[in-house]
Amino acid sequence: MGRLDGKVCVITGAGGGMGREAALLFSEEGASVCAADVDLDAAEATAAQARDAFAHKVDVADEASVRAMMDATAARYDGIDVLYNNAGISPGDDASVLDTSVEAWERVQAVNTKGVFLCCKHGIPHLLARGGGSVINVASFVAILGAATSQIAYTASKGAVLSMSRELAVQFARQNVRVNALCPGPVETPLLLSIFGDDPAALERRRAHWPTGRLAKPREIVNGALFLASDESSYVTGSTFLVDGGLTAAYVTPE
């Protein structure tokens, strides 16, 4: 038996990185999956490798698009049990508050903050209709710590996701809907590797602050998401669920 047998999961940002890993792992564990992404080709590639999944094109910043994704999933599988709100962006023009444009700020907030809001707004009613479920909102360790090398819009967006998750957890606790903020540390994703590929010295500067001395593998983060999606976490809600290799615990790291 799989840990998610009989569950229906909506996963955004499923075209790559942690979203893709989640779609494959959740499907392996028995779930039926909506693999949603703004890039339909990438979503279809993920769905094709999963045991039971379908691809759906979604713009999480667009309300009609999010509503259509939830409705399509519920119609196909007769309901929804798990929301894995993973889609997010971290553009290169998001930097210091002194340099980041209002346009860049708004673009990040639209996807990272508004996107999670819309997925919860239009997804939670489907969970309520099933008698409960699990919402996993992907925040970040930067919602806990500040950074001298700033991505001000991204950091603010992830702080908003963390606060939103706590409030939703309290609001829906007695209706058996659990809401948790998954806070990954730095993860070996194409996006992050491309950033460090242009500046290898930046990777080495950061490595000194990671207790493990390495980036997380996407599957290591998604294993935490699997726990939150499963009934094993039935008494876990409102949590700041850190999977960060000890980063937020560190004052100094090993020599």
Regions found by a protein language model. Give the residues of each.
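Alpha-helical segment proximal to the catalytic Tyr-Lys
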Residues: 125, 170-174, 234
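Short C-terminal tail/terminal secondary-structure segment
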Residues: 90, 94, 226, 237-255
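Active-site helix of classical SDR
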Residues: 120, 157, 165
